[in-house]
């Protein structure tokens, strides 16, 4: 299993499929499990790359605080280790912030897809973000915390899928210190004054029922990006897990439109 290194921090990643690289960046606290369904939509014609943020899963967990610039440097280390000259970046929540910062500071981003994210961490509902965390050894608490991640009724309507998510979370989610460090990185981020620098084609996708980042923040992000476009979906904060087929179709459309000229 490949591991990249940024300074003294080891970063776990894995790939599947062939073709142009699509790299996924997770939201605060969650392991790469949250991309499982979207990876299934894309793997094959594309190479998918998922990795564990520092503080999460099989990557090292140095003490915080963390910031988005450091996490973007971690992403650069992963892409460099893998030998990806260019990559399409898909980030959710904190991961979208990391993708934005990466596009400003590094040269490998071909396109961006930002899911349930904002350029201004002060627009994140800090209480709702904190409510997503639960002890990894408490399955019922993990299950309950998912209510804020999805739209109303989804958790109760799909018990088998939720059981699977709970099992993944016990193994891969951040520990309490990692959660705290990643939450702080989320709420402290502010790129509102520099969005004009991000000329990468960017698709902003937002769940209309997002309880963590208001949908208006996603619309504003798309409006403020030079090459931004916005798509709303009837879903909650984890829009890619709740509606992977719809998100996958949007991503394939973006990659078909912008992919060839970047490779």
Where are these regions (language model features)?
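Flexible "cap/lid" loop of the alpha/beta hydrolase fold
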Residues: 100-140, 178
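Acidic catalytic loop of the alpha/beta-hydrolase fold
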Residues: 208-213, 238
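Conserved HGGG/HGGXW glycine-rich cap/lid loop of the alpha/beta-hydrolase fold
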Residues: 5-64
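Conserved alpha/beta-hydrolase catalytic His-Asp/Glu region
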Residues: 122-123, 142-194
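Short beta-strand/loop motif that positions the catalytic acidic residue
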Residues: 198, 204-206, 210
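Gly/Ala-rich beta-loop-alpha elbow adjacent to hydrolase catalytic centers
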Residues: 91, 95, 99
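Catalytic active-site module of serine/aspartate enzymes centered on a nucleophile-bearing elbow/loop
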Residues: 227-263
